[in-house]
C-alpha cells in the first residue's frame, strides 16, 4: 500500500514570477522560499513526486540540495530538469529547495504530490499550514 496526498498541487510557474512566496528567512533576494517541507509539518517519511505537464528547466524549475543537511552553498543547488510526461521522486521533505524568478519564456505547469510507503506511515497530530487539513488518512492522505 501507498499513502498518497489526496489532492495534488497544480503548479504554474509563470515567466517573470515565482510560484512560491518569499520567506522572512530567505538570505538572498533571488533565492525565493528556501525551505524543507518538514518545516511545514509534513510527515518525515514523505516523498515528493513531480510530474511536469511542460518541460522543467533552468529558472522555471525547482532548485534543490543533493542530500539532506548537505551544507551545500545555496547557489550551488541543482535545477530539476524534467521533460513533460516524465516524473521525479525527491526527498524535499528533508532537502532544502527553492524557486527563482522564472526568466525563461516558458510557463512551467506541473502536478506535485506526496507519497509515503504505508509501512513507514504513522499518525502525527499536525496539520497543513496552508489549509489546516490534518496530515492523516481520510483528510490530507488516502490509501491506495
Please annotate each region the language model reported.
Residues 8, 47, 109:
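Residue-level detector of short, conserved catalytic/binding motifs and their immediate flanks
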Residues 10, 15-17, 39, 54-56, ...:
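Short, solvent-exposed loop/turn segments at secondary-structure junctions
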Residues 26-89:
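Catalytic core of non-heme Fe(II) oxygenases with the double-stranded beta-helix
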Residues 72-144:
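Catalytic core of Fe(II)/2-oxoglutarate
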Amino acid at each position: 500500500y501507498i499513502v498518497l496526498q489526496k489532492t495534488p498541487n497544480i503548479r504554474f510557474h509563470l515567466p517573470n514570477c515565482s510560484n512560491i512566496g518569499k520567506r522572512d528567512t530567505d538570505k538572498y533576494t533571488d533565492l525565493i522560499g528556501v525551505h524543507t517541507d518538514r518545516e511545514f509539518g509534513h510527515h518525515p517519511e514523505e516523498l515528493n513526486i513531480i510530474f511536469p505537464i511542460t518541460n522543467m528547466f533552468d529558472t522555471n524549475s525547482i532548485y534543490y540540495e543533493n542530500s539532506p543537511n548537505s551544507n551545500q552553498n545555496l547557489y550551488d543547488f541543482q535545477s530539476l530538469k524534467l521533460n513533460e510526461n516524465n516524473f521525479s521522486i525527491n526527498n524535499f521533505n528533508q532537502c532544502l529547495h527553492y524557486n527563482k524568478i522564472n526568466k525563461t519564456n516558458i510557463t512551467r505547469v506541473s502536478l506535485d504530490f506526496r507519497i509515503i510507503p504505508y509501512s513507514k506511515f504513522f499518525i502525527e497530530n499536525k496539520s497543513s499550514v496552508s489549509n489546516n487539513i490534518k496530515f492523516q488518512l481520510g483528510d490530507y492522505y488516502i490509501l491506495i
